[in-house]
Amino acid sequence: EEQKADILSRIKATDSSDDLEGCDLVIEAVFEDSGLKAKVTQEAEPKLVANGIFASNTSTIPITQLAGASANAENFIGLHFFSPVDKMQLVEIIVGEKTSDETLARSFDYVQQIGKIPVVVNDSRGFFTSRVFGTFVNEGICMLGEGIHPASIENAGVLAGMPVGPLAISDEVSMTLMQHIRD
């Protein structure tokens, strides 16, 4: 419990790039909007240490596209944490066209150090796992529309090996974000 408190005390959410001075790694997790992500990239990158990594938590926007806003595309990578983060073990590592092997290796090590399972994928819209989870969630919503009880849908998802059911995932991600991604 003490170790947990110590670690949590070192994590700081911020809306000021000044708080990022000297960071080795920044993981951007703003809304799925290329313009907003570009703004955050350009404000945060100058604060990183030399060779610092800037990662986007995007779930759908191609990393190569997002890296276009970066002054150091070789240090730009995708680290997509799945919701709910405390239950989902996978972290999708998305390599852009200019992402260096060193950035990939350091990112892979980071994901393992925090106790998650890294999955390296190539760059494409939706990557791999968002496509899989999209199907899982969409089918759960369709089943709900067909009149199947929500508890039965959730239970089936968990029995199939998922940490949570499709309706819980859609609630966690939000219908607004899912519609934005689809459109």
Predicted regions and their residues:
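Conserved N-terminal Rossmann-fold NAD(P) cofactor-binding segment
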Residues: E1-D24, S34-G35, K39
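Beta-strand segments within the central parallel beta-sheet cores of soluble alpha/beta enzyme folds
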Residues: A5-R10, N75-G78, I153-V158
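Short loop/edge segments at beta-strand edges and connector loops
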Residues: D15, S56, N122
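Substrate-binding/catalytic subdomain of NAD(P)-dependent oxidoreductase enzymes
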Residues: I94, K98, R106-F108, P118-D183
